[in-house]
């Protein structure tokens, strides 16, 4: 892990930590996510340079060390509910933000939710609704598909392929999007402090473009990313996007996307009930 | 009888002197059929189709109206080939007479008001290139945001605004020095930019936010941003009337053109058009607005006095942009 440069003031640098084992011990999903995070960090660094800012990515298996010595303001990872629980707890205790890239557990967004955790990965509840909505037999529910073209999806797919020699899959998209989202939040919140990031992410203003054609945002009641999903049958030419707007219905993107997942009134998350001692750095 | 025929014959012979008297022509880039439809604005009929062989997208007329420039892309977005170019169409003969290199995957561009230079966005390279139109040489390649798209030149030629869809930025190029002097943070997926005739304001559409953003060009600061179509319209094309009083925005997803009061940014009219209007252009007198409706394979013509569609012109496949030449 590179040593942090003491000369870099926090306000100009967003330090992001990717929590993953060494390359040899990574599952395919982890490897994909890592590629997405790397490209996301490269692109965020390019965008940041336009504003005289820096984005730094540090990787390691030891999340506590990333927060301590690595001085990261956000942790990315989570490839199983137990790991998301642990990383969410650590982030909450140490006052940083955790972005879940790969956990589907509904409880993580419900009874066990934490204010410091934000879920880019869709929940099991979202996946179930997407599957039933889609009307495609035998299709897997995905965040992304290499065959997507609209809204600049072709550009993103081409950039990823040019960078890594293979197509972008769901985990690749999640990693790429998580970094883009964090960098843009820091820029728009005019702060790379975790407390300011968190406040921005919970605000109505926080909207992101993920090349899916709709503004993406986090639900304030459970910090789940609202996003279209794609159901691809092995035999089909192109994936089916869900949810689709009802023809003629006058719905906002938020209303359409909230058809996937747990509505506010059914949420068991009590975000406001942070434990004593739970504070975010910068508050 | 005889003299009438002779007069007709003379009027058909193209010459620079007579070119001034001809009706304005609307040139439409058809991304799907890889050709350019030429519409006579008096009759609103297609009078010529110019094949270009590859995907044409951005299209602009030279200030003197004698040439039309069109951005061409091949099928390989991340590689530069002979297919990637800015083609020059001679308005009098309606033929492609020259090609300029403009980096890989040129999509949108602007011609400076003096007609001397062309600034293009290179979508996959994240750059904007300045080309000298007299020599065809690339004068400068400048780093802008990721996935650059819309390009606009200020009326005095001093500033070039380049949007970038992934970075959500507008890069401001000082055309005198060919340097990026600042970057403006936009809403989500900024697409097109247009300056007011007095140069004091620039308007930027943001496709995914569904907003129109107004920039003070003295400070390059965002003054405000207004939602169109409740944020769901996916706006792309934007033009300003010659008197500066009206701003027209093409909302692709809403299949409608929004007319705004330039001073208050209040909507004064909403004009339903064909499916997925993207590129729009006004005639020089501001009396007609031409909208390329990509999924209708038509150009819809709006009378700006009544804000009504007065003609629907079938063109090629997937019309993308439109430019008016004298």
Set out the residue ranges of the language-model regions:
Chain A
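Extracytosolic ligand-binding ectodomains
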Residues: 1-283
């Amino acid at each position: 892990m590179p040593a942090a440069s003491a000369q870099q003031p926090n306000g100009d640098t967003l330090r992001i930590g990717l929590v993953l084992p060494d390359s040899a011990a990574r599952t395919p999903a982890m490897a994909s996510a890592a590629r997405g995070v790397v490209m996301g960090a490269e692109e965020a660094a390019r965008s940041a340079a336009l504003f005289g800012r820096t984005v730094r990515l540090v990787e390691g298996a030891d999340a506590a060390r990333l927060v301590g010595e690595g001085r990261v303001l956000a942790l990315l990872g989570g490839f199983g509910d137990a790991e998301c629980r642990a990383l969410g707890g650590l982030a909450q205790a140490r006052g940083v933000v955790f972005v879940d890239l790969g956990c589907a557990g509904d409880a993580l967004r419900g009874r066990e939710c934490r204010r410091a955790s934000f879920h880019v990965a869709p929940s099991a509840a979202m996946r179930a609704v997407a599957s039933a909505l889609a009307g495609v037999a035998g299709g897997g529910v995905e965040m992304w598909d290499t065959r997507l073209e609209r809204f600049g999806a072709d550009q993103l797919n081409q950039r990823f392929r040019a960078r890594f020699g293979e197509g972008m899959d769901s985990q690749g998209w999640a990693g790429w999007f998580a970094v883009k989202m964090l960098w843009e939040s820091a820029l728009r919140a005019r702060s790379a402090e975790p407390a300011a990031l968190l406040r921005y992410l919970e605000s109505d203003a926080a909207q992101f473009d993920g090349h899916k054609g709709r503004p993406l945002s986090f639900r304030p009641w459970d910090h789940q990313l609202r996003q279209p999903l794609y159901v691809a049958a092995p035999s089909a030419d192109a994936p089916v996007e869900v949810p689709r707007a009802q023809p003629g219905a006058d719905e906002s993107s938020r209303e359409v996307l909230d058809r996937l997942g747990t509505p506010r009134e059914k949420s068991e998350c009590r975000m406001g009930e942070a434990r004593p001692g739970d504070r975010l750095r910068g508050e | 009888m005889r003299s009438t025929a002779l007069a007709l014959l003379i009027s058909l012979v193209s010459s620079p002197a007579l070119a001034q008297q001809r009706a304005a022509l609307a040139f439409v880039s058809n991304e799907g059929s890889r050709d350019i439809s030429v519409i006579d604005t008096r009759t609103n009929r297609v009078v010529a189709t110019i094949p270009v062989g590859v995907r044409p997208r951005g299209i602009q007329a030279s200030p003197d109206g004698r040439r039309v420039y069109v951005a061409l892309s091949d099928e390989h977005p991340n590689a530069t080939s002979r297919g990637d170019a800015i083609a020059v169409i001679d308005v009098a003969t309606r033929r492609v007479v020259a090609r300029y290199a403009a980096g890989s995957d040129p999509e949108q561009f602007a011609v400076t008001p003096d007609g001397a230079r062309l600034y293009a966005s290179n979508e996959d390279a994240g750059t904007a290139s300045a080309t000298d139109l007299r020599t065809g040489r690339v004068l400068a390649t400048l780093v802008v945001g990721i996935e650059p798209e819309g390009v606009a030149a200020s009326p005095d030629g001093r500033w070039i605004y380049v949007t970038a869809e992934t970075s959500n930025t507008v890069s401001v190029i000082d055309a005198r020095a060919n340097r990026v002097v600042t970057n403006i943070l936009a809403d989500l997926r900024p697409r097109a930019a247009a300056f007011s005739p007095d140069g004091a304001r620039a308007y930027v559409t943001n496709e995914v936010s569904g907003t129109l953003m107004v920039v003070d060009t003295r400070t390059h600061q965002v003054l405000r941003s207004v939602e169109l179509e409740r944020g769901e319209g996916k706006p792309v094309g934007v033009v300003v009337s010659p008197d500066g009083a009206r701003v027209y925005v093409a909302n692709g997803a809403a299949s409608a053109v929004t007319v705004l009061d330039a001073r208050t940014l209040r909507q004064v009219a909403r004009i339903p058009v064909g499916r997925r209007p993207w590129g729009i252009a006004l005639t020089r007198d501001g009396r007609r607005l031409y909208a390329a409706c990509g999924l209708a394979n038509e150009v819809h013509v709006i009378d700006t006095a009544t804000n009504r569609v007065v003609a629907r012109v079938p063109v090629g496949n997937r019309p993308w942009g439109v430019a008016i030449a004298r």
